[in-house]
Amino acid sequence: MGGFTSIWHWVIVLLVIVLLFGAKKIPELAKGLGSGIKNFKKAVKDDEEEAKNEPKTLDAQATQTKVHETSEIKSKQES
């Protein structure tokens, strides 16, 4: 068997869906699904942009190390 390759399989599936949910409820479900997908894509895009704008943690650690080393050198020179 080839699965759902026949048009009649799809017709039966659609009839079952209409019987389960009703003709009025299907557009509401589709609208909700579409808005959910849209919100998900927007959230993924926002997270990607946020990740690009964040400073790298390695760079921040290197800067802190340089500041610490510089302050140690100054304190030794003053002593």
UniProtKB/Swiss-Prot annotation:
Keywords: Cell inner membrane, Cell membrane, Membrane, Protein transport, Translocation, Transmembrane, Transmembrane helix, Transport
Subcellular location: Cell inner membrane
Superkingdom in the source lineage: Bacteria
InterPro entries per the UniProt record, alphabetical: TatA/B/E, TatA/E
Biological process terms in GO annotation: protein transport by the Tat complex
Annotated region (Disordered), positions in chain: 46-79
GO MF annotation terms: protein transmembrane transporter activity
One CC-aspect GO term: TAT protein transport complex
UniProt keyword Protein transport, yes or no: yes
Bilayer topology term: Single-pass membrane protein
Ranges of Basic and acidic residues composition bias in the record: 66-79
Main location: membrane
Pfam families: TatA_B_E
Keyword check for Lipid metabolism: no
HAMAP family: TatA_E
NCBIfam families with a match to the protein in the record: tatAE
Functional description taken from the UniProt entry: Part of the twin-arginine translocation (Tat) system that transports large folded proteins containing a characteristic twin-arginine motif in their signal peptide across membranes. TatA could form the protein-conducting channel of the Tat system.
Protein family: Belongs to the TatA/E family.
Protein's UniProt name: Sec-independent protein translocase protein TatA
Organism of derivation: Helicobacter pylori (strain HPAG1)
